[in-house]
């Protein structure tokens, strides 16, 4: 790890925080940043988790203060997510790097579809939301499954959670977003613990990236661009395409 690594990672992680604050999907930029810098995939995932924990902690606290997290619904989902992410992280560390890259290659088109699709989600008013036993079960199941994915890889986790909580658990977008923040914090913490235990986190780089990520998030939230999501979508798709090409070149090389 040298100065060039920091020069590649930090600006992109800053952009990731900025993008995430405006329209979500920052992880689609932050993890590729580590991979572009030539960091091994498992270490890249672990270090990305380290910097992501800071951003998700701030976001979760902010949503909680605004009353956007239903604690009774979030708690079982958070517990399920914690277990799922731990499983996913351990699976990631046991997988050969080549297999992990192949899995990423298969996941990327689906993530790109979610980023591009504008009509997948349906908003619901608070009156339309009916939190029943089914809601608790589907929310916990979603959290567990996405938790495994987040521990295994990560980018797009927030998007997956919002989609599942909206479509499967039938929560409104505002409520789904709030629950997703709490669940995502749990998945990040759980998987980070596993990666730290196995020594696959570059602490100096992670700290620098965390500062850049939080600064980007602060500026992005402050600007609050009305057309932010529309402007960000092409950037996310470009990053996905570049990462797709990067992984193919690694597999062929």
Q: Where are the regions that the model predicts?
A:
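Selected transmembrane alpha-helices and immediately adjacent juxtamembrane segments
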Residues: 1-40, 126-177
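Helix-loop junctions at the membrane-solvent interface of multi-pass transporters
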Residues: 22, 65, 94-95, 117-118, ...
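Selective hydrophobic functional segments
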Residues: 46-106, 188-238
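Transmembrane helix exit motif
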Residues: 58-68, 89, 105-131, 244-253
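Residue-level signature of the transmembrane alpha-helical core
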Residues: 10, 14, 18, 49, ...
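Hydrophobic alpha-helical transmembrane segments in multi-pass integral membrane proteins
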Residues: 145-153, 191-199, 206, 243-253
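Transmembrane helix-loop junction
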Residues: 36, 43, 89, 93, ...
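Small-residue hotspots at the loop-to-helix junctions and early N-terminal turns
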Residues: 42-46, 177-181
């Amino acid at each position: 790890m040298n100065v060039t690594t920091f020069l590649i990672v930090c600006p992109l992680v800053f952009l990731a925080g900025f993008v995430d604050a405006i329209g979500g999907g920052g992880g689609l930029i932050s993890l590729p940043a580590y991979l572009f810098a030539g960091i091994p995939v498992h270490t890249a995932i672990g270090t990305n988790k380290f910097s992501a924990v800071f951003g998700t902690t701030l976001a979760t606290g902010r949503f909680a203060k605004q009353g956007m997290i239903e604690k009774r619904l979030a708690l079982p989902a958070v517990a399920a997510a914690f277990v799922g992410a731990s499983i996913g992280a351990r699976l990631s560390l046991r997988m050969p790097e080549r297999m992990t890259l192949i899995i990423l290659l298969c996941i990327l088109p689906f993530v790109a579809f979610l980023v591009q699709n504008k009509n997948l989600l349906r908003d619901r008013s608070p009156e339309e939301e009916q939190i029943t036993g089914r809601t608790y079960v589907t929310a916990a199941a979603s959290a567990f499954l996405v938790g495994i994915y987040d521990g295994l890889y990560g980018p797009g986790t927030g998007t997956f959670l919002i989609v599942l909580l909206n479509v499967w658990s039938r929560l409104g977008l505002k409520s789904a977003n709030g629950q997703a923040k709490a669940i995502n914090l749990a998945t990040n913490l759980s998987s980070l613990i596993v990666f730290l235990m196995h020594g696959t986190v570059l602490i100096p780089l992670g700290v620098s990236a965390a500062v850049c990520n939080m600064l980007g998030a602060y500026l992005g939230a402050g600007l609050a661009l009305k057309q932010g999501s529309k402007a960000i979508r092409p950037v996310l798709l470009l990053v996905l395409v570049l990462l797709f090409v990067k992984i193919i070149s690694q597999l062929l090389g």
